[in-house]
Swiss-Prot record:
Primary role: Calcium/calmodulin-dependent protein kinase involved in the regulation of Ca(2+) homeostatis and excitation-contraction coupling (ECC) in heart by targeting ion channels, transporters and accessory proteins involved in Ca(2+) influx into the myocyte, Ca(2+) release from the sarcoplasmic reticulum (SR), SR Ca(2+) uptake and Na(+) and K(+) channel transport. Targets also transcription factors and signaling molecules to regulate heart function. In its activated form, is involved in the pathogenesis of dilated cardiomyopathy and heart failure.
Catalytic reaction list: L-seryl-[protein] + ATP = O-phospho-L-seryl-[protein] + ADP + H(+); L-threonyl-[protein] + ATP = O-phospho-L-threonyl-[protein] + ADP + H(+)
Family membership: Belongs to the protein kinase superfamily. CAMK Ser/Thr protein kinase family. CaMK subfamily.
CDD domains: STKc_CaMKII
Ranges where the record places region Autoinhibitory domain: 283-292
Source organism of this protein record: Bos taurus
Binding site for ATP: 20-28, 43
Protein name (record): Calcium/calmodulin-dependent protein kinase type II subunit delta
Membrane topology: Peripheral membrane protein
Keywords: Acetylation, ATP-binding, Calmodulin-binding, Cell membrane, Kinase, Membrane, Nucleotide-binding, Phosphoprotein, Sarcoplasmic reticulum, Serine/threonine-protein kinase, Transferase
InterPro entries registered for this protein in UniProt: Ca/CaM-dep_prot_kinase-assoc, Kinase-like_dom_sf, NTF2-like_dom_sf, Prot_kinase_dom, Protein_kinase_ATP_BS, Ser/Thr_kinase_AS
Active-site residues, Swiss-Prot/TrEMBL: 136 (proton acceptor)
Length: 488
């Protein structure tokens, strides 16, 4: 009988030290590779607590991080799965957050801001060249390699990152941190790489004056500002900023993603590549002072969130009222944890699941509307050509393809001039990974019979949906109860 061997490679090769940070299902600890003495940061995920979707997200994060090798990105060195735990071994970044370092400097100018955003753009460009969209660019995820002067800026936390094909635009779910979300995400439009460039525009704006371009305690009003692109360059603080810097911000904060500047284009902008002659060298004390207040607000919100998480006395709605994004801090160590804690992930996950379920209900309603209207063309656009079905009209047989359904559309549904109204009751949606879902519901159909009397039919339906190229298609349904076509 063959025996199964449990992997113990992490336990054998690495020694664990103090905790650097903590999330819902993971902890980050300093570790050392025993054979070399090299220090790293280990993100330790308790896989026993993960759902199937969480497992998929973990695999995606590891796959993405393995792909990205750049001096301005926190590097994944190892990914090891052991019994009950998964270990992601990252660079040990000890310089803390970029924004915290800036406020500790004696001198900070527009040219320094240019150098910071250049490194961020280099990391984003590398991601985009490799078909990766980060989706959560914000100050908390911009770290410094060390405490040394001139240490490299490192982009961290790829927990929300996605893989895209070329310039593909699709709906990948509602993800990000409120103040850095792009208009297209808020509109629930298909999106892609340009969302990262919008976030870069928000970050650059903050780097120059110490406060964000979009701000409101009320989240709905904040989102309205973002969708309208309602920002400006108020006096007096913007009077000393060069026109070239403002031009780059305008190109990044362009509402239309198709017209928004790309990372490679931004790196060629004069304010970036001709910094020494274009960017101002004047010390910006007002920016430093404002940035201190901005950082303090973020830390306060982080402390409040930590308390809420500890007591579990929180709701998705309360978490969504944090436009800056927040971080949970568990360690007094100077070492920075390189994962976003539950600040954005809880918010996004709750919002993402809710939005995706609503999407399935909406597309199901569209399909039923096509049936009621006798619109076979609209029906075929929503259904897979190989659609399988169990329905009363088929007398218990499994039917495949469109021909069986075409008969009813052409000979009954399209020729009916009776008013029909359908209600979906108690819809239950099960999300199966990122690209599949199942919905079960009661369907009530109201119509007028041949004698002009109102009638109601009831059926119980289950539909299976699969997303291809960003579009949901019905691949299977099972209906019991009344048939589709109202009987006189």
């Amino acid at each position: 009988m063959a025996s199964t061997t449990t992997c113990t490679r992490f336990t054998d090769e690495y020694q664990l030290f103090e905790e650097l940070g903590k999330g819902a299902f993971s902890v980050v600890r300093r570790c050392m590779k025993i054979p070399t003495g090299q220090e790293y940061a280990a993100k330790i995920i308790n896989t026993k607590k993960l759902s199937a979707r969480d497992h998929q997200k973990l695999e995606r994060e590891a796959r993405i991080c393995r792909l990205l090798k750049h001096p301005n990105i926190v590097r994944l060195h190892d990914s090891i799965s052991e019994e009950g735990f998964h270990y992601l071994v990252f660079d040990l970044v000890t310089g803390g957050e970029l924004f915290e370092d800036i406020v500790a400097r004696e001198y900070y100018s527009e040219a320094d801001a240019s150098h910071c955003i250049q490194q961020i753009l280099e990391s984003v460009n590398h991601c985009h060249l490799n078909g990766i969209v980060h989706r959560d660019l914000k100050p908390e995820n911009l770290l410094l390699a060390s405490k040394s002067k001139g240490a490299a800026v490192k982009l961290a936390d790829f927990g929300l990152a996605i893989e895209v094909q070329g310039d593909q635009q699709a709906w990948f779910g509602f993800a990000g941190t409120p103040g850095y979300l792009s208009p297209e995400v808020l509109r629930k439009d298909p999106y892609g790489k340009p969302v990262d460039m919008w976030a870069c525009g928000v970050i650059l704006y903050i780097l120059l004056v110490g406060y964000p371009p979009f701000w409101d305690e009320d989240q709905h009003r904040l989102y309205q500002q973002i969708k309208a692109g309602a920002y400006d360059f108020p006096s007096p603080e913007w009077d000393t900023v060069t026109p070239e810097a403002k031009d780059l911000i305008n190109k990044m904060l362009t509402i239309n993603p198709a017209k928004r500047i790309t990372a490679s284009e931004a790196l060629k902008h004069p304010w970036i590549c001709q910094r020494s002659t274009v960017a101002s060298m004047m010390h910006r004390q007002e920016t430093v002072d404002c940035l201190k207040k901005f950082n303090a607000r973020r830390k306060l919100k982080g402390a409040i969130l930590t308390t809420m998480l500890a007591t579990r006395n929180f709701s998705a709605k309360s978490l969504l009222k944090k436009p800056d994004g927040v971080k949970k801090r568990k360690s007094s160590s100077s070492v920075q944890m390189m994962e976003s804690t539950e600040s954005s992930n809880t918010t996004i996950e709750d919002e993402d699941v809710k939005a995706r379920k609503q999407e399935i209900i909406k597309v199901t309603e569209q399909l039923i509307e096509a049936i009621n209207n006798g619109d076979f063309e609209a029906y075929t656009k929503i259904c897979d050509p190989g659609l399988t079905a169990f329905e009363p009209e088929a007398l218990g047989n499994l039917v495949e393809g469109m021909d069986f359904h075409r008969f009813y559309f052409e000979n009954a549904l399209s020729k009916s001039n009776k008013p029909i109204h359908t209600i979906i009751l108690n819809p239950h949606v099960h999300l199966v990974g990122d690209d599949a879902a199942c919905i079960a519901y009661i369907r009530l159909t109201q119509y007028m019979d041949g004698s002009g009397m109102p009638k109601t039919m009831q059926s119980e339906e289950t539909r299976v949906w699969h997303r291809r190229d960003g579009k949901w298609q019905n691949v299977h349904f099972h209906r019991s109860g009344s048939p589709t076509v109202p009987i006189n």
